[in-house]
């Protein structure tokens, strides 16, 4: 039945969270003008709620279909997806599908002000995209730090039978290969994340009031479950990094706080006028032990299967996280969804936005083995736990062998750590040997009069959150009419583009950078300055082996190096084969909100034609 515009708009603004998952109002017709028939449909309701996952107290969260974390989406490669979002929040939102390239659907990337208009309170938005690549990805809010309020969930795209796998490099037994394929089809996802008792809005309020960069969390949660641990002073001092001890010994503080955090001193924050008297005690100092929260997450595996597949996903707001499993090495077979030449390791480091897929051989005695997770940054001693249970048994094994302590310190000699920068894609996938275009970035805090929480990738200015509110998103515009700047860059279709990120010292923090719209190759990295205009010029001056154009890592999230008393740099190379307006940014949520992002207009010479459904109607057909 036809409906007029008034009925259409009224329907969008009054959708009930109790509607069945397959419901489409009669006046909201999914547009099939740019995707094939028989799509796989998902419907999510975003609602405000309260949660107490660690036992330290309830706080405001965003629930996805009534749960924290959101449900897992399971697809097959080649599926056409319709992902309907109904916004019951009191604020704008948008949903990004992290790692999905959106090569034929840049209007479904989920970046307000860049690829779409925000989803207003009470409105609905229909994302349409094709599952062109297989592996594990995740969806999350991409508006004003809502990711830190729990709006995320996993995406598993099953691989096609024609995809070559590297499983023969893990085991020489052909019988194991089919067991591994079956384990991968049944992969269990673990969303490992830092957790704050403050909502993201409260975090930003604390930053502005005290004029600090917020660097202290409360706990680590796994699939929305965890606990806040308050360690004795003796243990805190034992676990404090020697460099941190040395630096604090030259200050009035002398030691880390009861929450395990480095105090927000000017030495670490920078030369800003701090207002530390406005800080709530719970922000950096007061530790509230978890009581009565949800139990730590348990992964159940079955010993008869001989192998289990797990994927660790870090949707967290701040910290890269180390992971070990007692008594079990891990065979890493995919990173950011893409197969690699496997590495057998004891420990992986999962940066914000990354996904690590591992096989675990189920050859131990039946029991419950501890999965240990720890913050990798120097600024806080923080750990968390989950469990790997054989056949649902909850008894501890007779001979547990932990590999790291609560703070991430190694408990064994010669622990095998995953080598991110020697990750080789499988099958081999080399980049172009020479780039057509280079963009350089200087990551630093903005100096006064800007706040201590404001960042830049241009070295001059930050990408303000008000970009989300522009009347016409950049994808909707003629790119020739968009003014370019250090924050607005362009490429032509099918160019090979180098992105060189230099992080300013003297304490060059590691940043997890994410490029929307493409995976990229990590062709080089180093500690020190990068004064050269291009990689080709740098090759003439840097040691042989600094750059890799044969088999470099191929990812969508990239960790810059740390530098002590120095700068650090990272060189990425990607193929600009997906025209559209794409965000390139740090995945630490306070850094992104503080300005650490740029917009790249890829393929301006073959700009995509925007479907009317997205230009005017949030992905739906126009009412008649």
From Swiss-Prot:
Gene3D superfamilies per record: Cupredoxins - blue copper proteins (2.60.40.420)
Plastocyanin-like domain boundaries: 48-160, 216-373, 474-603
Record's function text: Multicopper oxidase; part of the gene cluster that mediates the biosynthesis of elsinochrome C, a perelyenequinone phytotoxin structurally similar to cercosporin. The first step of elsinochrome C biosynthesis is performed by the polyketide synthase elcA which catalyzes the formation of nor-toralactone.
Induction text: Expression is up-regulated during the late stage of P.nodorum wheat leaf infection and is controlled by the cluster specific transporter elcR.
Keywords recorded for this protein, A-Z: Copper, Glycoprotein, Metal-binding, Oxidoreductase, Repeat, Signal
Keyword flag Oxidoreductase: yes
Protein name stated in the entry: Multicopper oxidase elcG
Gene Ontology MF terms in the entry: copper ion binding; oxidoreductase activity
Known glycosylation sites: 65, 271, 296, 464
Binding site for Cu cation 4: 511, 586, 591
Pfam families on file: Cu-oxidase, Cu-oxidase_2, Cu-oxidase_3
InterPro entries noted in UniProt: Cu-oxidase-like_N, Cu-oxidase_2nd, Cu-oxidase_C, Cu-oxidase_fam, Cu_oxidase_CS, Cu_oxidase_Cu_BS, Cupredoxin
